[in-house]
Design a protein with these regions (language model features):
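Short, structured helix-loop boundary elements
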Residues: 20-23, 47, 68, 127, ...
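Pre-recognition alpha-helix immediately N-terminal to the DNA-recognition helix
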Residues: 25, 32, 52-56, 117
Length: 154
């Protein structure tokens, strides 16, 4: 049975009340985790973006160097905003700039021992919170992403 013109928007099926509830629940679950994260990061004396940048440096994909361009992309922020975060982290003793061994023109970012300690503590707390929040997040995602072949909610 095809969808009438009233059942689609731009060729996509209109959302049902159940779809909106699933989206709202997913956003709620994400927001709960982010609220936890903001409090934990603030208690450690950092800003949310600073923690994210440190995590991005430590968690760069294999073969990708921690350059400003890559970090800005990973964080989805502008280059100048990334530089500002790096400057504040460097002033606080959390990160340092290094020259690449194979290309001395290239500047890479690295965590200092202080940055490593703070990141490890925060990441452990975040990992534990995610373990606790995972059932709610997974359930919300399942509501949003019905298995193939399953009838859509109505």
């Amino acid at each position: 049975m095809g969808l009438s013109r009233d059942d689609t928007i731009g060729g996509m099926r209109k959302l049902t009340v159940s779809d909106y509830q699933a989206l709202a629940e997913f956003r709620y679950q994400i927001r709960r985790f982010l609220h936890f994260s903001e409090r934990a990061v603030q208690a450690a004396g950092l800003e949310r973006g600073q923690y994210q940048l440190m995590l991005a440096i430590k968690g760069m994909p294999e073969g990708v160097r921690p350059r400003i361009r890559e970090l800005a992309n990973r964080m989805q922020i502008q280059h100048h905003s990334t530089v500002e975060l790096i400057n504040r982290l460097e002033s606080g003793g959390y990160v340092r700039r290094e020259r690449a061994q194979d290309d001395r023109r290239e500047v890479l970012l690295a965590l200092t021992p202080k940055g490593e300690r703070v990141l490890e503590e925060l990441a452990l707390h975040h990992h534990e919170e995610l373990r606790s929040a995972a059932p709610g997040l997974v359930a919300a995602l399942r509501r949003l992403m019905p298995e193939k072949g399953a009838k859509s909610r109505g």
